[in-house]
Amino acid sequence: MIKKIAVLTSGGDAPGMNAAIRGVVRSALAEGLEVFGIYDGYQGLYNNKIKQLNRYSVSDVINRGGTFLGSARFPEFKDPNVRAKCAEILRSHGIDALVVIGGDGSYMGAKLLTEEHGFPCVGLPGTIDNDVAGTDYTIGYQTALQTAVDAIDRLRDTSSSHQRISIVEIMGRHCSDLTISAGIAGGCEYIVASEIEFNREELIQQIERSIIRGKRHAIIAITELLTDVHSLAKEIEARVGHETRATVLGHIQRGGSPCAFDRILASRMGAYAVDLLLQGKGGYCVGIQNEQLVHHDIIDAINNMQRVFKADWLKVAKRLE
């Protein structure tokens, strides 16, 4: 029977992480468990930055963006000796289980602690990219989506005033859920997704045809890392004769107060993680599918499960362009 659990946030921050921490802490305390916060992710664990938390430690955090526990990239965790030391530190505090909030990289760390050291871990999907398998939505995605749509709305105001073409680069790496969803909600004329091969010439020809039909301005939503958007803007302007500007939303998408959906999702997932650990179920990750909370073997989720590309959403977006 577990008596003490710890929680950490790892990788890129996401709105709603604080709500998830709160869900873990207060649910665990309600079950008579002691809870410890690990500051600055796996790096903080390695440096023994561990502090006991109480219910007041998570007061007034549900509405705050970021993560009050802090986060950090820690590639050194790939070293088996580093992981062994981390497991030893956890046990030196009498900690019986760990909740990890983050993306795929964070899950991998939890997987290795479970596999190599038999340490019960539960992963919660915390990333704005929505690129974690086994869940329809990740914590932070809906808030980041609203941030992107708000930016697109503002860009449309100025683009329409100046008959300008605006390119908006949206986060997501190899997952275009944010781009596709923001493109639909923002009424973008063109959406460029990372899952589909990017054809610059085809895009420019589409814009040229739109201008011939009388289009006076346009918004192009594109997933990051596909191309240099500033170079693309110059090429479009030279070819079509319309002023073209690129805006990189960047890390602004990670900040801000989490929306109601993310606060509720994170709170539910945090409580669910504690329930799993109380049932003796370590080595799992939590997701939401068809509005129901679910859990998957974390090893299976990393090695075998594939995130579902929203091809039907992109098809709708293309029809609405």
Swiss-Prot record:
It catalyses: beta-D-fructose 6-phosphate + ATP = beta-D-fructose 1,6-bisphosphate + ADP + H(+). GO terms for molecular function: 6-phosphofructokinase activity; AMP binding; ATP binding; fructose-6-phosphate binding; identical protein binding; metal ion binding; monosaccharide binding. Transmembrane segments: none annotated. Its EC number is 2.7.1.11. Its cofactor is Mg(2+). GO terms for cellular component: 6-phosphofructokinase complex. SUPFAM superfamilies: Phosphofructokinase. Keywords: Allosteric enzyme, ATP-binding, Cytoplasm, Glycolysis, Kinase, Magnesium, Metal-binding, Nucleotide-binding, Transferase. The active site is at 129 (proton acceptor). It comes from the Bacteria. InterPro entries: ATP_PFK, ATP_PFK_prok-type, PFKA_ATP_prok, Phosphofructokinase_CS, Phosphofructokinase_dom, PKF_sf. CDD domains: Bacterial_PFK. Pfam families: PFK. It is found in: Cytoplasm. Pathway: Carbohydrate degradation; glycolysis; D-glyceraldehyde 3-phosphate and glycerone phosphate from D-glucose: step 3/4. Catalyzes the phosphorylation of D-fructose 6-phosphate to fructose 1,6-bisphosphate by ATP, the first committing step of glycolysis. NCBIfam families: PFKA_ATP, PRK03202.1. Belongs to the phosphofructokinase type A (PFKA) family. ATP-dependent PFK group I subfamily. Prokaryotic clade 'B1' sub-subfamily. Homotetramer. This is ATP-dependent 6-phosphofructokinase. It comes from Haemophilus influenzae (strain 86-028NP).
